[in-house]
Amino acid sequence: MNNRVHQGHFARKRFGQNFLNDQFVIDSIVSAIHPVPGEAVVEIGPGLGALTEPVAARMDHMTVIELDRDLADRLASHPQLKDKLTIHQEDAMKINFSELAELAGQPLRVFGNLPYNISTPLMFHLFSYTSAIRDMHFMLQKEVVNRLVAGPNSKAYGRLTVMAQYYCNVIPVLEVPPTAFTPAPKVDSAVVRLIPHVNTPNPVGDVRMLSRITTQAFNQRRKTVRNSLGDLFTPEQLIELGIDPILRAENISVAQYCKLANWLSAQSTPQE
C-alpha cells in the first residue's frame, strides 16, 4: 500500500502535503477555532477538507486558499462544500489579506494545516497583514511552535520569536503526533493560536528597523551583541539603552529589541 495516497489523492512532496486524519485532533482544532456564522473565515491549505468540512458546517460561507489544482477542483465539486466556498487556487504567499478583509468588511480569522516547508516565510507574510487579521490558528512543526512561544535565554528563541511576539500574543493549543497524518511526517506537530495585538505592548516606529536588527543579531547568534551589532551601536550606546554588550542575541528581550529599533530609527531621522 502506498502511504502517500489518501482518499484517492497522491500527497505531493513539493507541496509539503501531509493530510490530517485523526478525528480527536480535528475536533480539538475546530473547538479551538470556534467559528461563528457571519465571521470572515479563511483556510490556508485545506487539502482534502479534514478541517474545512467541520468548520464549513458551522458557517454559511468561508474562503479557502489552495495551491494544488487537483485539490482545489475536488473542493469545487464537493457536494457539501461547493456552495459555501470561495476558492483561491493560488500561492498564499501572493495573497493580499488586507484585500480579503476589505471585501469581507471585517478582520479575518485565518487557520490552516500549513505545509512545513513554507510555514516560516508564510508566517512573516501574514505578520505584515495583522491589522486585517483577528486571529490565526495553525498546525505547524512542533519545533516551529516552540520557537514562536520561546522566551529569552533559550536555544529556541530567535528572530521568528521576536517578530511573532512583536505582532501577536502567541498561545500553544495542542500537540499532535505523526500518526494523526497520512503520510505520517517525520516530526511532531503542534497547534498554535496567534492573536494580533490591538495595542502593541512595545510600539516600533519602523518595523523594518526591528527586522534588520534581529536578522543581523540572530545571523551571528554565537557572537556578543558588541560584535554582531557593532556597526549599528557602540558599547556605550548599548549600555545607555540598558543592554550589556557582552550579551548574545538570545539574551535580549522583545522589549529591548524594540527599544534598539526605535533608538536607531531616531538616529536615522534627519533632525529639523
UniProtKB/Swiss-Prot annotation:
Keywords: Cytoplasm, Methyltransferase, RNA-binding, rRNA processing, S-adenosyl-L-methionine, Transferase. GO terms for molecular function: 16S rRNA (adenine(1518)-N(6)/adenine(1519)-N(6))-dimethyltransferase activity; RNA binding. The keyword Ligase does not apply. It catalyses: adenosine(1518)/adenosine(1519) in 16S rRNA + 4 S-adenosyl-L-methionine = N(6)-dimethyladenosine(1518)/N(6)-dimethyladenosine(1519) in 16S rRNA + 4 S-adenosyl-L-homocysteine + 4 H(+). It comes from the Bacteria. It is found in: Cytoplasm. S-adenosyl-L-methionine binds at N18, L20, G45, E66, D91, N113. Its EC number is 2.1.1.182. The keyword GTP-binding does not apply. SUPFAM superfamilies: S-adenosyl-L-methionine-dependent methyltransferases (SSF53335). Its main location: cytoplasm. GO terms for cellular component: cytosol. Specifically dimethylates two adjacent adenosines (A1518 and A1519) in the loop of a conserved hairpin near the 3'-end of 16S rRNA in the 30S particle. May play a critical role in biogenesis of 30S subunits. PANTHER family: DIMETHYLADENOSINE TRANSFERASE, DIMETHYLADENOSINE TRANSFERASE-RELATED. Belongs to the class I-like SAM-binding methyltransferase superfamily. rRNA adenine N(6)-methyltransferase family. RsmA subfamily. This is Ribosomal RNA small subunit methyltransferase A. The gene is rsmA.
